[in-house]
């Protein structure tokens, strides 16, 4: 596994992070997002993203910027598939399109900020390392039902490979957990995410997602049948 074979979007983003801004790379990343989302429906509800861009997301060595690049890739993917989306950065500095990892990981405060806007769902996108007030996210998550807050909150783990050990990277184990390490997992992650939304927006997304997937499978079958 390398930094650049976990999907085209994150591969371009890794190069941007490691080599500095390039108009050509930025355009290639944008095109990769468009191609990856072309056949997906749009979720019409309100989505809040708590995006971890704290210092720990930089990592080091061969994995430098890898988890962060995959998190940003997922964010750009979501931005194309969500009609109403708001991002709450945890740490980070510089360009909002390509934030540099910096600062502490205070996921709890960002979650509270996100919930104030009453979204249909909150996705916490993080590498799982909580280095500010450890345990606060778990306490906040556990207290939400007592505060009559029933907004679905899902923890989305950004990984380097499918074999990453997450045992020490679950700051709120009671939250529903989704994992991703490759761009190919994004569509199913969206399906899992929005299936937790109550109401018509979630139902509509699931229905359109499955219909588009069925149509794609039928087209693939027709091509295969014609060539055999």
Question: What is each of the regions a protein language model found here?
Answer:
Residues 2-228:
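Acidic, glycine-rich A-domain
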């Amino acid at each position: 596994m390398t930094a650049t074979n976990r999907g085209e979007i994150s591969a371009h983003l890794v190069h941007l992070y490691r080599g500095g801004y390039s108009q050509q790379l930025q355009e290639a990343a944008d095109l990769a997002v468009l191609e990856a989302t072309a056949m997906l429906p749009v979720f019409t509800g309100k989505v809040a993203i708590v995006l971890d861009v704290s210092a720990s997301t930089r990592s080091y060595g061969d994995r430098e910027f890898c988890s962060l690049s995959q998190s940003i890739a997922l964010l750009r993917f979501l931005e194309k598939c969500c009609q109403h989306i708001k991002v709450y950065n945890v740490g980070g500095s510089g360009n909002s399109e390509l934030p540099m990892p910096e600062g502490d990981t205070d996921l709890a405060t960002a979650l509270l900020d996100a919930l104030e806007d009453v979204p249909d769902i909150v996705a916490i996108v993080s590498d799982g390392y909580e280095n500010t007030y450890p345990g606060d996210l778990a306490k906040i998550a556990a207290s939400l039902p007592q505060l009559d807050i029933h907004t679905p909150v899902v923890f989305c783990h950004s990984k380097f490979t499918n074999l990453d050990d997450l045992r020490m990277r679950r700051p709120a184990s009671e939250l529903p957990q989704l994992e991703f390490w490759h761009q190919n997992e994004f569509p199913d992650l969206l399906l899992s995410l929005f299936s937790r939304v109550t109401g018509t927006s979630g139902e509509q997304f699931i229905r359109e997602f499955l219909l588009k997937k069925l149509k794609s499978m039928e087209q693939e079958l027709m091509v295969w049948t014609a060539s055999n």
